[in-house]
Amino acid sequence: MVRYRTRSLSERPHEVHGQQVHGQDQGHNGQEEQGLSPEHVEVYERTHQGHSHHRRRRCSQRRLHRIHRRRHRSCRRRRRRSCRHRRRHRRGCRTRRRRCRRY
């Protein structure tokens, strides 16, 4: 009973939905694929590349360089303090150096 109901309910919407979508999309896509889709693809590629390059330029030149310097200086200070405060635990300094190098 349950299996038969789930199959019938799942098959009917897919068939009806698939026919409606294909029937409507064939008329629109026939026109859009020839004239509008290449234009949309080109515009989308240009805008997408422009945004990605624009963001990368800002982050790589200004922000990341400054942030890396700040982190590097702060990490040096923290290393000295941690090493002076914890002379016995040398493993902590090594793990912190590895973390700083990753950034």
From Swiss-Prot:
Testis. Keywords: Chromosome, Developmental protein, Differentiation, DNA condensation, DNA-binding, Nucleosome core, Nucleus, Phosphoprotein, Spermatogenesis. The keyword Phosphoprotein applies. One of its GO terms (cellular component) is nucleus. It comes from the Eukaryota. Proteolytic processing into mature chains is required for histone eviction during spermatogenesis. Transition proteins (TNP1 and TNP2) are required for processing. InterPro entries: PRM2. Residues 8-17, 39-48 have a biased composition (Basic and acidic residues). The keyword tRNA-binding does not apply. GO terms for biological process: chromosome condensation; nucleus organization; spermatid development; spermatogenesis. Its main location: nucleus. Belongs to the protamine P2 family. Interacts with TDRP. This is Protamine-2. It comes from Erythrocebus patas (Red guenon).
